[in-house]
Curated annotation (Swiss-Prot):
It comes from Desulfovibrio desulfuricans (strain ATCC 27774 / DSM 6949 / MB). It catalyses: L-methionyl-tRNA(fMet) + (6R)-10-formyltetrahydrofolate = N-formyl-L-methionyl-tRNA(fMet) + (6S)-5,6,7,8-tetrahydrofolate + H(+). InterPro entries: Fmt, Formyl_trans_C, Formyl_transf_N, Formyl_transf_N_sf, Formyl_transferase-like_C_sf, Met-tRNA-FMT_C, Met-tRNA-FMT_N. Keywords: Protein biosynthesis, Transferase. Attaches a formyl group to the free amino group of methionyl-tRNA(fMet). The formyl group appears to play a dual role in the initiator identity of N-formylmethionyl-tRNA by promoting its recognition by IF2 and preventing the misappropriation of this tRNA by the elongation apparatus. This is Methionyl-tRNA formyltransferase. (6S)-5,6,7,8-tetrahydrofolate binds at S116, I117, L118, P119. Pfam families: Formyl_trans_C (PF02911), Formyl_trans_N (PF00551).
Length: 337
């Protein structure tokens, strides 16, 4: 029978996604977490005060030693890590490059929790890209537990798990995958300790890349199908945010204006056949925008400099007296310059 706390683990991670794995490892009877590595404290918030990472906060709560080197390329940092004599390096969204000398340190393996079904969506933004690209019915996202190699997210895979994308935003899918990854990580570490873990090489011909998102990735393209627009909006929620600009026509007691908005996921409505994509209409309660095939009713909206609000509040406030029916068009911020 295996002894308790016989797996010496150095955990490496930084954001909330990684904290889920650390929390689960701390509850695993075999885990002896000898150290937690996380990125240095960074300025955050309006005051730009130094803030601890989610992983550091949890490690301190758990009473685990914390190391925060700016790099692991130097001999001193590597010697400090080697002194922990890890059986495994358990890595999740750490954010620092691990040199070959570091990858060779653990007795069993350096293992990474990656939020995609590899070899698909290697890179920095697999969760957001999975939602944005997963607009077709039955689309799924997942987790891969892989052995870390010298190439980004290209190492052999020990285990995978998946879940339906459904109506997830990238924010809600992030949380679901963090928990799934934490469970799979413990399973793989147990298999490694028992000598039954098998890592399967990835098929390079199927590899795709999930590039980091920028603000422009949130500019909504209303010429696409409503399902694709809905997936784009969910994929960039909460960050970097789905953005459009309403160009509204003048009417009785209403001056023509342009209104930039960040929009939350809404609902797909009836066909918009015969209506130009981007056309805006309202019925006094909701604002809908014509996509390439159907109308899309907006969810919560956030005008510039304001907080999220129901569309009804916007229509009763800033857009009071906006003529009902088709009343303008929506364009991307780039097209509105």
């Amino acid at each position: 029978m295996a002894q308790e706390k016989d797996c010496r683990i150095v955990f490496m991670g930084t954001p909330g996604f990684a904290a889920a794995s650390l929390r689960r490892l701390a509850a695993w009877p075999r885990a002896h977490i000898v150290a937690v590595y996380t990125q240095p404290d960074r300025p955050a918030g309006r005051g730009q005060k130094l803030a601890m990472s989610a992983v550091k906060k949890l490690a301190l709560e758990l009473g685990i030693p914390v190391c925060q080197p700016a790099s692991l390329k130097g001999a001193e940092a590597q010697a400090e890590l080697a002194a922990f004599r890890p059986d495994v390096l358990a890595v999740a969204a750490y954010g620092l490059i691990l040199p070959d000398a570091v990858l060779d340190m653990p007795r069993l393996a350096p293992v990474n929790v990656h939020a995609s079904i590899l070899p698909g969506l290697r890179g920095a933004a697999p969760i957001q890209r999975a939602v944005m690209e997963g607009w077709q019915p039955g689309a799924r996202a997942g987790i891969s537990i892989m052995r870390i190699g010298s190439r980004l997210d290209a190492g052999p895979v020990y285990a995978m798990g998946d879940t339906p994308i459904g109506e997830h935003t990238s924010g809600s899918l992030h949380d679901a995958l963090a928990e799934l990854g934490a469970e799979l990580l413990v399973t793989v570490l147990d298999d490694l300790m028992e000598g039954r873990a098998v890592a399967v090489e990835q098929d390079e011909s199927l590899a795709t890349h999930a590039a980091k998102l920028g603000k422009r990735d949130g500019y909504i393209n209303w010429t696409r199908s409503a399902a694709e627009a809905h997936a784009q909006i969910r994929g960039v929620t909460p960050r970097p945010g789905a953005r459009t600009v309403l160009h509204l026509d003048a009417g009785t007691d209403f001056e023509a204006r342009s209104m930039p908005l960040i929009v939350s996921p809404g609902t797909i409505g009836e066909t918009a056949a015969g209506t130009a994509p981007g056309s805006v209409r309202h019925d006094g309660q909701d604002i809908s925008i014509a996509c390439g095939d159907c109308w899309y009713t907006l969810g919560m909206v956030r005008p510039e400099g304001r907080k999220d609000m129901p569309v009804r509040d916007l229509l009763n406030g800033s857009l009071k007296n906006l003529p009902q029916g088709v009343c303008g068009e929506a364009r991307s911020p780039e097209e509105s310059l």
